[in-house]
Amino acid sequence: MTAAHLTARRAGSLKGTVRAPGDKSISHRALILGALASGLTEVDGLLESDDVRRTAAAMQAFGAGVIRTGEGAWRVEGKGGFAEPGDVIDCGNAGTGVRLIMGAAAGFDLAATFTGDSSLRGRPMNRVLKPLGEMGASWICRAGGRLPLTLKGGSLKRIAYRLPEPSAQVKSAVLLAGLSADGGAEVFEAEATRDHTERMLRGFGAEVDVTEESAGRRIVLPGGQALKGTRIRVPGDPSSAAFPLVAALVTPGSQVTVEGMLLNPLRIGLLETLGDMGADLSVTNVRDEGGETVADVTARHSALEGVETPPERAPSMIDEYPILAVAAAFASGRTVMRGIGEMRVKESDRIALMAAGLAACGVEVEEEPEGMIVTGRGGAVRGGGRITTHGDHRIAMSHLVLGMAAEEPVSVDEPGMIATSFPGFVEMMRGLGADVGADVGGDVGADSPVGA
């Protein structure tokens, strides 16, 4: 089968200033909360990726008015709740979108059927369905809690739910369901996860009480609250900013600045880890935008050293481990990443794919059930891998960054999937001086060292 793919080659230093695309987590929540609210919500800087557009279409299907008024500028006319959709809700590849939407929809007297692409249909939804079921929602789905799934909502009761493992998506789904539940909702998390839902609920006029306890965080959402439309400025996504920043760190002579990057304290695990590795990073122009800390971050080529990442840091950088593994490949010594089993149930088994992809590029890597160990040789990476991504955008972008600094080109298949989170990735990296080219090759997957 002939498949289009992208190839990245070493092309000298990367230099320039860019702005990261809007944060994906906040973009999903802006649309969903805007649809649940009464009145107009205006959003600036929305990430216009396929994932987020799927959520926008879903909000229209649930009865909200959703209009694009300019680049990154959207208006959501909420009706104070969800109406029953007239068709199946296709969430594409958007795992965040479907889980949050199911939580929001569970509180209304409706039936809604959700599906997605082959990747999303293979991802289990049980972690979200369990608390929603305890609140009173019901559903019919495939084995293992997989899509397609029909959710029946309405008449929810209060829940006090302890997260069995860190998950901002599960926490957010419970809180969104709690908006319509009799008595609201309470969530306890032993490890703090990204708190955009709590912050944004307050921005829409809701009361949310967060208490720091010795064993974790308790979030209480009182019942009977109505949301009101508001204005939202979406900051730059740190998960997307990670790619140009790490590319600069591993490419000799490089200096790249990412403007307007979100620095939420629960999203900066990668920056902290890169700092531990000796990365030359500077943070300037720190300011507050819409209740979130935002700044400009500059990365310069650095001689990195291997480190052991604390497992408790995982929730603050769970999406960044693939690109951290690339940084580790160029570092001196061992980088140990443990407590990251969540990576196995993302868009793909990211531990397995990164381990196989790095090995295909000549990097020493050990795969573990809940982690991996990458041993770098101080800047020397052979490259040359032809990578099967299994449709995972972060696997694709991480290996392309590796190819920008490796001795031999690196190719990835299914490049169209990059648009699920970072539609302007290739153009941005080319603007900084990277050599990334699209080709139509032979059977990209069949002879790849990274098989199915």
UniProtKB/Swiss-Prot annotation:
The keyword Methyltransferase does not apply. Its EC number is 2.5.1.19. InterPro entries: Enolpyruvate_Tfrase_dom, Enolpyruvate_Tfrase_sf, EPSP_synthase, EPSP_synthase_CS, RNA3'P_cycl/enolpyr_Trfase_a/b. SUPFAM superfamilies: EPT/RTPC-like. Its main location: cytoplasm. 3-phosphoshikimate binds at residues 24-25, 29, 167, 169, 319, 346. GO terms for molecular function: 3-phosphoshikimate 1-carboxyvinyltransferase activity. The active site is at 319 (proton acceptor). It comes from the Bacteria. GO terms for biological process: amino acid biosynthetic process; aromatic amino acid family biosynthetic process; chorismate biosynthetic process. Pfam families: EPSP_synthase. GO terms for cellular component: cytoplasm. The keyword Cytoplasm applies. Pathway: Metabolic intermediate biosynthesis; chorismate biosynthesis; chorismate from D-erythrose 4-phosphate and phosphoenolpyruvate: step 6/7. It is found in: Cytoplasm. Phosphoenolpyruvate binds at residues 24, 95, 123, 169, 350, 394. It is an enzyme of class 2 (transferase). It catalyses: 3-phosphoshikimate + phosphoenolpyruvate = 5-O-(1-carboxyvinyl)-3-phosphoshikimate + phosphate. Belongs to the EPSP synthase family. Catalyzes the transfer of the enolpyruvyl moiety of phosphoenolpyruvate (PEP) to the 5-hydroxyl of shikimate-3-phosphate (S3P) to produce enolpyruvyl shikimate-3-phosphate and inorganic phosphate. Monomer. This is 3-phosphoshikimate 1-carboxyvinyltransferase. It comes from Phenylobacterium zucineum (strain HLK1). The lineage of its organism: Bacteria, Pseudomonadati, Pseudomonadota, Alphaproteobacteria, Caulobacterales. The gene is aroA.
